[in-house]
């Protein structure tokens, strides 16, 4: 078993050793605290079938917990919408917020293992930034992650992945993610 006190995730070590220096050189930061870093990664699964069967939210939360390595929180409806047959406080999905070492581990697994397993994968879109240095992407299948057993999946559920950075602009955030080998198309 690995000694937990001396273990540093691969991307966290890469950030400390090479990414910070490359970002400082590229953008000309005067202070080390100006250099953008990863803040958090939020994984979200919306379960549309939860209106008919609330047990599907529980299985989605279990799968998301396996993928993230930490317990998923069930999200509830804020208010009732009669057209969608949604009632207030009805479970609709689940989410996980990753920070610290788990965040770097997940990003490493996403880039090196999960994204290459996506069918017809050419790269991720480079225009999915929000204007404040955060990147959002979606996956249509949860079994691109090795933690999910393909045979035990009842229903194919997609997920949203939001990568939040401390970057002020989209260009800085894109450069940061490129340093982590995020495979952008454009």
Curated annotation (Swiss-Prot):
* Pfam families the UniProt entry points to: Ribosomal_L5 (PF00281), Ribosomal_L5_C (PF00673)
The record's section on SUPFAM superfamilies has: RL5-like
Q: Looking at the UniProt record for this protein, which Gene Ontology cellular component terms does it annotate, in alphabetical order?
A: ribonucleoprotein complex; ribosome
Alphabetized UniProt keyword annotations: Ribonucleoprotein, Ribosomal protein, RNA-binding, rRNA-binding, tRNA-binding
Q: Which GO terms describe its biological process?
A: translation
GO molecular function list: rRNA binding; structural constituent of ribosome; tRNA binding
Top-level taxon in the UniProt lineage: Bacteria
PROSITE patterns linked to this entry? RIBOSOMAL_L5
Return the Gene3D superfamilies for the record.
3.30.1440.10
Please give the subunit comment from the record. Part of the 50S ribosomal subunit; part of the 5S rRNA/L5/L18/L25 subcomplex. Contacts the 5S rRNA and the P site tRNA. Forms a bridge to the 30S subunit in the 70S ribosome.
Q: What the protein does?
A: This is one of the proteins that bind and probably mediate the attachment of the 5S RNA into the large ribosomal subunit, where it forms part of the central protuberance. In the 70S ribosome it contacts protein S13 of the 30S subunit (bridge B1b), connecting the 2 subunits; this bridge is implicated in subunit movement. Contacts the P site tRNA; the 5S rRNA and some of its associated proteins might help stabilize positioning of ribosome-bound tRNAs.
Q: Which family does it belong to?
A: Belongs to the universal ribosomal protein uL5 family.
Name of this chain's protein:
Large ribosomal subunit protein uL5
Question: What gene does the UniProt entry assign to this protein?
Answer: rplE
